[in-house]
Amino acid sequence: MENSGKANKKDTHDGPPKEIKLPTSEALLDYQCQIKEDAVEQFMFQIKTLRKKNQKYHERNSRLKEEQIWHIRHLLKELSEEKAEGLPVVTREDVEEAMKEKWKFERDQEKNLRDMRMQISNAEKLFLEKLSEKEYWEEYKNVGSERHAKLITSLQNDINTVKENAEKMSEHYKITLEDTRKKIIKETLLQLDQKKEWATQNAVKLIDKGSYLEIWENDWLKKEVAIHRKEVEELKNAIHELEAENLVLIDQLSNCRLVDLKIPRRLYLTQAAGLEVPPEEMSLELPETHIEEKSELQPTEVESRDLMSSSDESTILHLSHENSIEDLQYVKIDKEENSGTEFGDTDMKYLLYEDEKDFKDYVNLGPLGVKLMSVESKKMPIHFQEKEIPVKLYKDVRSPESHITYKMMKSFL
């Protein structure tokens, strides 16, 4: 055992130095070689133990033979002595049985030795086989592994190239399939069109004269309908242009007539056209009305003329501001503040009512400034209006009857 341990230590010291890092294939080979070496060492150790046992058995057999001879001699002496003493004599059969037992024991020992020798021979054969395998793997590690690694890399490159070629071929086949499908579809459509034309030609050949004339007339009517539709569209466009020009001309004429009549713009917008005055003009002219209403505290003669002039202006403002409820509330607040202004407001509203009735007569009389010079003032009773009246006036101004129409414009001309 000590010799085997020393031999293993020498093998470990005498072996080549280990590398720091090895590839997987070489590491596997080293691992397998180590396993084989360990197995060989175990077998060698078993062989040595068996040899030692064999030597021990040989020594024991020799010792047993010597003991056997000694016992035989001793038995013979005892027999001789027993015979001499008159003891029972050992017969030959007893001796033979004893000898047979010893022979059987020796035979068993010999069989055991043979078995041990057979095991030793088998172990030696295995040891030789393992040594041959070890040499083979060492040669493969030194020479064949590099060659196989090169083969593996070349095969991997071949596989990659085959995959790339397969992908390119598949893409090419897809493109060719799409092109062929498109070509087939185009050819089928062309063939269908040709067959339709041939069918129509054959049908026309077989058609009677009456039906042929009907078909020809139908085509002619379709063409005429298309031409008629184009003409209708052109006429509609021309009509729209003429209507726009007419509206422009009517607007110009109305503006010219209004300038000739000298009617204020807000009066026309509120009474004739039924429109609303923008809030900017309202806010600009409201303070003027308050100033004029404050100037009513004067003598009676001047008061009458001022009232009429202020009545015309207030009619314009009242009609222009009737669309908003806030102006009505503002007028009511002024009534509560000044009792003298209530008389002027009632007269102004009465005159407004009269102007609405006789609007056409005022227009036919001529300029509005000359008409106002002939107005005389009169004292009238005060009529307090209810709160619902301005709402009714607001509704009346916005009614469809108050809007301007073609007949109204014709009356101005």
Swiss-Prot record:
Disordered as annotated region, ranges: 1-21
Which residues constitute the signal peptide according to the record? none
Which residue windows are coiled coil? 37-184, 216-256
- Indicate, by first and last residue, each region the UniProt record lists as having compositional bias (Basic and acidic residues): 8-21
Q: Which domain of life is it from?
A: Eukaryota
UniProt keyword annotations, A-Z? Coiled coil
> What InterPro entries does the entry give?
CCDC83
Q: What is this protein called?
A: Coiled-coil domain-containing protein 83
Which organism was this protein described from? Homo sapiens
Question: What gene is behind this protein?
Answer: CCDC83
